[in-house]
Design a protein with these regions (language model features):
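Single conserved hydrophobic/aromatic residue that forms the stacking wall/gate
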Residues: 1-8, 12-13
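Conserved AdoMet
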Residues: 16
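C-terminal/domain-terminus segments
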Residues: 112-146, 158
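Extracellular beta-strand-rich, repetitive "passenger/adhesive" scaffolds
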Residues: 20-22
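Flexible, glycine/small-residue-enriched loop-and-beta-strand segment within the central core
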Residues: 26-36, 41-117, 144-145, 151-161
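Extended, charged low-complexity segments
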Residues: 161-167
Length: 167
């Protein structure tokens, strides 16, 4: 389900699974480079700058204001200025690295995922984190830069807090 306040009828995503819910506004720079798995939830202000491929697994949830970026820009000032190419046209240097997110991941509010990052399956990324490097499967990671805090284990269950809930 895509909520009416999303972005407009011209928005496209390369591949969107079943049962995806996006609470607008959400934004995709291109959209054609993004794949979203089944039963994912994107809260408001979810933003993907998909200059390179972005792959999101099944059953992923994103809190408000999560941003995924793939472009890389030069560090040196003279390389950030326009450069004239052999064809005489001024261009700005930029390249991009793909982002991959495994199945069953949860992202708290205000998380930023940086270019080239792979996040394994069954991960939780704490609110406000800036993910600059890969996160292994089954990890809770948080901070700026994000680091693995600990593995997620059966002791993390909340089922006992909700009597009558099964599943």
């Amino acid at each position: 389900e895509i909520m009416p306040s999303l972005v407009g009828s011209e928005m496209c995503i390369r591949d969107r699974g079943e049962g995806v819910c996006m609470l607008g506004p959400v934004r995709f720079h291109y959209g054609c480079h993004t794949r979203v798995g089944n039963h994912c939830f994107m809260n408001f202000n979810f933003t993907v700058q998909d200059d390179a491929p972005v792959t999101i697994g099944d059953h992923c949830n994103f809190g408000p204001n999560v941003t995924i970026v793939t472009p890389m820009h030069p560090m040196l000032p003279d390389e950030r200025r326009g450069m004239v190419c052999d064809d005489g046209v001024e261009r700005f240097l930029c390249y991009a690295k793909p982002v991959t997110i495994g199945h069953d991941c949860w992202f708290g509010a205000n998380v930023v995922v940086c270019p080239g990052v792979t996040i394994g399956e069954n991960c939780v990324i704490g609110a406000g984190s800036v993910v600059t490097r890969d996160i292994p499967t089954g990890s809770f990671a948080a901070g700026n830069p994000a680091r693995v805090i600990r593995p997620i284990t059966a002791a993390d269950t909340v089922r006992g807090r909700f009597p009558g809930i099964r599943g």
